[in-house]
Amino acid sequence: MGKTKSRGRRAEKKNKKNEPGFNEDVSNLDSDVTITNQEPLSSSISSTSGIPNTFFGLVDNNELDYFKQAESTLNINAFETDEERQGFINSVLDEAQGKELKLVTNQICSKLMERLILFANHNQLKKIFKQFQNHFVSLAFHKYASHVLETLLVRSAALIEKELTQTDEEKLEKAEEEEAEENSLNNDVPMEDLFISMLNEFKPHLTTMIDHSYASHVLRLLILILAGKELPSSVTSNSTLRSKKSKIARKMIEIKDNEDFDRAFQTPQSFKNELREYCQTIIAGLDTKSARELSIHKIGSPVLQLLIQVEGLVDRERSFWHLIFAKDSEGKDSVEESFVEYLLSESVGSHFLESIIKNDGARPKYIERLYKLYMKDRVLKLAKRSTTGVYIIQALLFKLKPVEVEYILDQIIPELAELISIAENQNLDLANKLIDASISRGNYRRDEIINQLFIKFAPNYDIENPSDNTSTEFIENILQLTGSTLGNTRDDWPTAEERKRALFLEKLMEYDYKCVICTWFNFMALPIERFVQMCFHGVFCHVVEKALIVEPEEPKPIQILRKRLLNIFQGQIVGLACNSYGSHIVDSLWNFTVLLPMYKDRIASELLGDSHRVKESTYGRLVWKNWGMELFVRKKYDWKALIKQQEQEYYGETEDSTEKRTKKPIELKMERLAEEKRRQEEMAERAQSGYTKRKLEEATGTASEKKQKLRGRRR
């Protein structure tokens, strides 16, 4: 007797087909595809935490090879024209039609889908968007699909703005194009409506998305789009969109953003209502305890920071802020005090507090309340917490009232040398922010800040009477030249730490000219080979360039010191001029040699001496032009006129200027000599004209008559 079939499968399949999570593509998988673990193909599996996990099927080997090759072709981008590339993209999209969901959940094919979305036109974008409908939640929680979804959301925001700003003529032209295209009837729905339908899919899952590794990034992007904020790049190091690992991965797979990233988009009025609903939905699922837990959660904290930043657009009560902190009218609370103390001492918590202080979401009175109740009486103690509390103090310097800022400066400046650690590389940022705060307060206590920094970085340097035996401790302690990439022959890229230190020294030189003088002495104390290496270094060359500045009304001792510094460059000019970094330094020497025409002539002569090498170099030709070397070679008088013009600009002697500077004694003496010479020339000219006149009179016979009259008059 034959084996009887088990009954009820058709009915079971029909019931599954009516379920909302059913995916028809999955049910029609090829028979040669094997599925591990025998999971239900189209079931939406919700775990206890409410995270959906829909299985969309596997990509078979033949499809995988094709899509892998297509991804490689797009990555190389060896197309001769944009039309050729667009044709290739169209063919790949045709091949991928109906398979989008299983492609985005595959590690290799998800990269292909991301590239296709970046290059797709508006109709293709809408088509892909529609394929994801009813599955956006599952994609947001997926490791690979979430990245594809983020790219799709950014491009969708750009398309929404374009549809909003379209003129009637553009709309008519678009309608004609759609009529000419196949399947145009499927793309007549506005992108705004498609986007709102997707937003509705996410609403039941918002609280689950907040602390999920992948969905939280999608949620943050949705909030940014709804609020009309700038959508950050997904590859830059300071991007708020992706995690550090994700940004590194994108650089490795060479997926670059298009012009839709790093900008804000115009949004319709309906988006503000959707943002309000999102905020209300999230806050309904939170209480004070859970909100505070999220604020110190590694994944949930950035989402909460963003919600606090944008809630003011739709909620005047600032519900998220008051869910975490007490109202501004309330006094000190022991539970809140413990929570704030934890924020001030823990890395994630301190980053959360710093972020909500720095962004424009919280009202100033909220921040001022927290500061006065829990931080004001221990500013110095918090500044000593080099990995947590110090960042809160730095943020407060630019958010509090001027009186409170000066109070913080008064507390920290006397102890600044103790707070900075050279060995452990701590609190350079604090010194940076103190300088910025001092500048914003009209250089408040500048001399004390500079003295503290010299105590830390150059304890043996005499600020008032610098001597010739000054060591290199100042630039060594700040730049950490020993152990840096300076002088490496392996083409090592300068590190981020070197860039940070170089910028700090540049800021010091802008802040006070004493730091410039100290840097000059340190340059002269360096071996010439080491100094030249700095000029060729990608980061330290900027330090050399920024040090080549001349102070107005420069005293004579400083001018002599400037001449001594210029002597270091002797014999190195041509090499620097032909280098991408050094050429900028040679350009700066034109202004640095003001009032020193002999040194200008020496540098120009050095360039002329090896003119063939200079002119062969791209950078050398720029230096040749900026130094006016053609005039130096052919019209030396005009070149000297350029120097004279520069000196007049330095002294402020222009035709329109009404103020006259006090002239130096040597200038007054030169003017007297010139005036005396002019008088002597006039007297000589008059004598010569009188002699010529007498000779003429003698020749005509009128001289004796005049002579008699003169004698008669004298009698």
Curated annotation (Swiss-Prot):
Q: Please explain the role this protein plays, according to its UniProt record.
A: RNA-binding nucleolar protein required for pre-rRNA processing. Involved in production of 18S rRNA and assembly of small ribosomal subunit.
Cellular localisation: Nucleus, Nucleolus
Against InterPro entries, the record matches this protein to: ARM-like, ARM-type_fold, NOP9, Pumilio_RNA-bd_rpt
Q: Please list the GO terms describing molecular function.
A: RNA binding
Question: Where do the Pumilio repeat units fall?
Answer: 95-130, 131-166, 201-237, 285-326, 334-372, 374-410, 525-562, 567-605
State the superkingdom.
Answer: Eukaryota
User: In which residue ranges is the amino acid composition biased (Basic residues)?
Assistant: 1-16
Which family does the entry's similarity section mention? Answer: Belongs to the NOP9 family.
- Which UniProt keywords are present, listed alphabetically? Nucleus, Repeat, Ribosome biogenesis, rRNA processing
- Which PANTHER family does its entry note? NUCLEOLAR PROTEIN 9
Q: Where is this region: Disordered?
A: 1-30, 651-715
- Mark out the compositionally biased spans (Basic and acidic residues): 657-685
Pfam families xrefs: PUF_NOP9 (PF22493)
**Can you name this protein?**
Nucleolar protein 9
This entry carries the following GO cellular component terms, namely: 90S preribosome; nucleolus; preribosome, small subunit precursor
Where in this chain does the entry annotate a coiled-coil region?
A: none
Q: Return one Gene Ontology term, BP aspect.
A: endonucleolytic cleavage to generate mature 5'-end of SSU-rRNA from (SSU-rRNA, 5.8S rRNA, LSU-rRNA)
